[in-house]
Each structure stands twice: as C-alpha cells, then as structure tokens.
Amino acid sequence: MYAMNGSFIYNYGADTIETGGAGSHGMVADNSYGENSGSIITHGVGSYGMLSLAGGQVHNLASGDIVTGNTYSHGLVAWGEGTEASLGTNAGTITTHGSEAYGALAIVGGEVHNLVSGTIETGGAYGHGMVARDLGSAPSLATNAGSVTTHGYGAYGMYALDGGIVQNLASGDIVTGNTGAHGMVAKGTGSIGTNSGNVTTHGTGAYGMYALMGGQAFNLETGMIETGGAGSHGMVASDDSYAENAGSVVTHGGSAYGILAQDGSFVLNSADATITTGGEWSHGMAANLGSMAVNDGSILTLNSNSYGMAAVSGSGAVNNGSIVTMGESSFGMLAWMTSYAGNSETGTINTSGDNAIGMYALGGSSADNYGYITTSGAGAHGMMAEDGSTARNWGDITTYGSAAFGMYALNSSFIFNYGAESIETWGDGSHGMIASDDSYADNSGSVITHGDGAHGMVALSGSRSRNLVGGVISTYGTGSHGMLADGEESLVSNRDEVYTYGTASHGMVALNGARAVNLEGGWVQTTSGDSYGMLADGGGSHAVNRGGVYTGGTGSHGMVASGDATADNLGTLNTLGNDAFGMLAQGGALARNMETGSVITFGTGSHGMVADGLDSLVSNRGHVGTNSAGSHGMVALNGARAVNLETGTVQTNNDDSYGMLALGTGSLAVNRGTITTYGNDSHGMVASDDARAINFETGTVLTSGDEAIGIYAFNASSADNYGIIVTWGSSAHGMKAENESTARNWGEITTYGSGAFGMYALNSSFIYNYGNESIETWGDGSHGMVAENSSLGVNTGSITTNGDDAFGMYALVDSGVFSSGEI
C-alpha cells in the first residue's frame, strides 16, 4: 500500500499485505498517514514492512504484525526529508530475519517509537533492533518503551549514529543474544544513547552500552545494564566519547568490565550509581589510551584479578566514592604505563583477597590517596609503586593480612606518606613502608605496625627510606624494628620519632652494607627486652646517631655493630634496662662515641661501651657514664680493643663498676682521656686473663671508693701507666698485678686512702716503677710498692709515702723488692 500527498492508508484486522520483490515495501506513507492492525510480510531484499517519507507517519498498532525475511529489510522506517520529520510507531510486533535488517529505523530526522506494548525481534547478523541515523531538521530519534530482542551476530539492541539519538525508556527492555551484539550504541559526534530501562546482553564481547567516535551513552537513574558473556563490558566509551552511569551495571563474564573508556574518552559512575562485576579479570572501571574514568558511586568486583578501577597508557582514574574488591589479586585501583590513579578525600577502597593491593602504580605511573584504603588479604599492600612510579598518601591506609605492607616502592619508584595517623598494619611481616631496588620512601606522617616481624620503614637493594620531620613510627610486635636498611647503598634515616614496643625490636637497623642514620632532632626509643636502639650488622654496614636514642628493656643496647660493621654516636644514648650496653661492637666491628656523643646507662651490668671478639673495637671521644652496680665504662672481650681517646671521659657511679676492662687473651684497654669511678671495687682500668691495659701520657685515671684500684692486671695480664693515676679510698691501690701479671709505671701514681699501696704485686707477679716523682701515698699503711707471694717489685723512679706505717717498698712471702731510685 502507498499513500502520498496527504493521503491515508489502513491495513485492518485479519488483512494481510505480502510482497515478494526487492524494494517492495508493505506500506508507504509519503507525506501521508498509514496504519497497520493486520499483518505485513515482505520477502525481497530491501523491502521494509512500513515506511514513512517526507513528514509522513506510519503506525503499527497493538494487533499489527510485521515480518520481513531478507537482507536490509527493516520492519519500520521513518525517513525525514528537508524540514519534514517523518514518524513511525510500533505497538504491535515486528520481526526481521535477514542480515542487516533492522526492527525500526529513523533516518534524516525521522522518529521511530516502540511503544509499551510493542515488540521488536531481529534474527540476522547486524540486524539491529532500532536505529537512528543522520541529521535532518532535527536529530533522528528512536525510543523504546516496549521490548527489543536481537539474535544475530553484531546485532545491537538500539543504534544511534551520525548524530542520531536512541532512548530506552523506563519500561523498555532490550535483550541481545549473540557475539558483539551490544545493547545500545551511539556512534559519531552528536550521537546519543540513553537508558532508563533494562539492557541485557548474553553474547561474547557484547557491551551493554557503547559510545564511540564522539558519541555519548547515559545509563540513567532507573537504568539497569546486565551482561553475561566474556569481554562483555557494561558500558564502553571509545575514540573521544563519553559514557555515564547513574543507575546499575552488572557483568558476569570474564574480562567484562563495568565501564571502559579508551582512546581519549571519559566515563563517569555518578553518585548513587552501582557497578558489580562477577567474572575473573573483570574490572569495575577502566580507562585506556589517554582516557579518564571517575567514580562517584560504588564499585564491587567479586572475582580474582578484577580491579576496582584501572588506568592504562596515559590514562587517569579518580575515585570519589566506594570501591570494594573480593577476589585474589584484585587491586582497588591500578595506574599502569604513565597513568594516574587518585582516591579523593571522600573515596574509600576495601580489598579482601590475597595480593589485592589497595592502589598500584606501575610503569612510570602515579597514585595519590587522600581518602581511606583498607586491605585484608595476605600480601595485599595498601599502596604500591613499581618501575619508576610514584605513590603518595595524605589519607589513611590500614592492612590486616600477613606480609601486607602499608606502602611499597619497587624498581626505582617513590612513595610518600604525609597523613597523620595514616598507615597502620596488623599482620605479621606487614611493614609500614618499604622501598626496594633503588627506590625511595619518605614519611612525615604516622606509621604503626602491630604484627611480628613488621618493621616501620624498610630500605632494600640500594633504596632510601626517610622518616622526616613530623614523622612518627611505632611498632608493637616481636622482632618488629622501627627502620631497617638491607644491602649496599641502602639507607634509612630519621629526623623525628621512632618507637618500638615488642621484644627484639630494634629502633634502626643496617644490614649487609647498608646505613642507618638518626639525624639531629631524631628520637629513637625501644621499650622491651633485647631491643637495641640502633644495629649495624654485616660488612660495610654503618649506624650513625646524631640525635637521641633511648632503650628501656633488659639486654637492649643503645647501639650495636656486628660483623665488620660500624656504629658511630654523635648524639645521646641512654639505656635503662639491666645488661643493656650503651654501645657494642662484636665480630670484628667498630663502635665509636664521637666528641659530641654521650653514652649513659642506668641498669645493672649495663656497660657503657663493649667490644667483643678479635678485631672488634670501641673508641670514645665524648662522654661515657654508667650508674648501676657492675656496669663498666668500656669493655674489651676475647681479643677486642677498647680505647678512650684524648677528649673522652668515662665515668662510673656505682660499686664494682670499672672505668675500663680488657678481658680475655689479646684484649686491650687504652686510655688517653679521663676515667673517673665512684664506688667500692670500681677500678679505673682492669686487664684480666691474658689481657692488657695502658694509660698513656694524656690519660688520667681517678677512682673514689674502697678497694677501687687505679689500674689492675689479673691472671697473666699486663698494665702500663704513662699518665696520671689518683685513688681515694682504703686499699685503693694505684696499680695492682695479680696471678702472674705485670704492672709498669712511667707516669704518676697518687693514693689517698689507708692501706692504699702505690703499686702491688701478688702471686708471682711483677711491678716496675720508672717515673720521676712517680709514686706518692698519703694514708696510713699505704706502702709505695708491695711484692707478695713470690712476686717482684723494682723501682728506678721516685717513691714518697706520707702516712704512718707506710713503707717505701715492702716484700713478703718469698718476694723481692729492688730500688735504684729515690724512696
């Protein structure tokens, strides 16, 4: 049937129109009006069911049925012309079987509407349900309030191109079933697709909505998009296009993203909108090739390797809403290949799976967090930067899984933490911040770890980790160090506060050639047992303190150098616990207290400085002080050396606390500075068990206590004095050699107590005095030199005694004394 020039045509009820030739349309209204309530069937190529032209109208009523069977044979067509906008509506049924045979087509400003009762079904490849294309006096328009179903390959539910507009209304339902059969497509600048109803796709690579080449796609508040096939994204914007979701998007297939932007496009998940993905590798939102993705709503991914948001190849992703991922290796946000990911102040990221990183920057990318990141799985770091990337945190990061770091920089990357109370980890081995392989980590906020073996900050393999001004590090687990550097060129440094509360949790650690530096203004404090303030272990490792170090637990030394390492103190060291040395060098290591350095210990058996083992050395140019019984100033053990240099002062303030002790074969104690002891039996210097003690010309040894000997050689040891020895106290001898030991004096010895000999040799020992005006005693019974029990005393210098019964030289029990000097 054909009506023209304002005419009318009707196909009623049981009537049937059937055509068989090519281009043989069922009904045509050319600037006219046509209705069908019967049946229309076409068989030829390019044979439409109903066609309106030049402002005409065609209507397929509720009882109307249109069937086309060949290629390009559309069911309903509205073809505008000039300023004339043609119209076509469907309230009945339209079925097409041929390839590229659309259910309804609006072209050159035409309009087609599938009404609430209308049903459109297409079966051929590229047989789109409804199409609006080309501009006329107005954009071409296709709307659906009914049902649209396509079965063919690449057969879209609704398709807008070249400036057309397609709308799936609130009551509209779109279903596609084949590969590449997208629900709605908007192609070209000015083309728009909107959905307020339901869009469902079942095929592989079948997107819910697709905007490309400048098109725009909108899933509105009531809109529901659901896809079931692999690679079937909910919404896609490509080639400078735009897609926005204000409703709901659900995908079930593998590699099926909620929303994807690529090739310079922009996608938005707006406030109150939801995205849910169920398949593996199905990200919530993704931006690729210079595109941008923004989330203001909520994103949920349920399977493994399914990121909340991903930005790739120069793209950006910003989260202002909520991201939740449930699967293994399902990152909250990913920025890859010079891309950017940002989580704003209102943004929240929660991941549950193992290795599910909160935010991950990779390949020269950057990630910023101003909001909240929480991870629960093992190895699920809060933020990670890798391969020349950067991650920055101004917000809050919390991890609960084991080996789940707060922030992690790898392979020449950078991480920065600026927020107060900002990083907290709860699992074992979950470090606060870690930099590895020539990377950098900076903290000016808060880092807290609770698990065992969970360090505050770590630098590995040539990396740098710095706790800056404002930074506070606190660890609570066993073996959880405040800061740790491992490997040559690795460095940790502190300018503010480091606290550890667990057992064997050191403040700062340098291993295997690394460095640990506590700078001016830095404070390091440990509170539990065996928790050193600073530790350097391994050849080339170096620990330096320029600030303050405080330890409170038993066996918690201030600074320790082990295995050919070095520890230097230029600041303040304080230890409170028992058996807590100020500084310890062991296994061939070196520990030095510099001129500005102060070492103070308060616990029992807490020596100021200790060197243990061959080639180990402790040296002092500053001040060393001990305050409890049995706490020596400086100790050399098992072949080690202890040296108090010209500017060094050593002071002990309790009983049985020697100024310096050398113990064991080959051990050596050297004094060139000042040693002062206050306490009974607190000798100035002691050499025991084949050891040696030397007080050089610049050295001064002062003791104040009963039986507090100036220098004491015991058990085949030797003691030499070239400097000054002064003792105050009864039986406080100037020098004593006992059990086959030797003591020699070239300097000055003065004693001020009763029974305080200048020099004393006991049990097959030897004493020699060579100095002019070298021995003077002031107490009763304070002999100048005494040799007892097969011992020998020789004087070629000067001996003066001032007390009663104070002999110049005295030999008893098979001993001998000889003098060629003055007595």
PLM features: residue spans?
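Glycine-rich beta-solenoid repeat tracts in large extracellular/virion proteins
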Residues: 1-4, 24-30, 48-53, 74-81, ...
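Beta-strand-rich solenoid/repeat architectures in extracellular/passenger domains
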Residues: 8-23, 38-46, 58-72, 85-99, ...
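Flexible coil/linker segments and helix-coil junctions enriched in charged and small residues
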Residues: 73, 77-78, 131, 415, ...
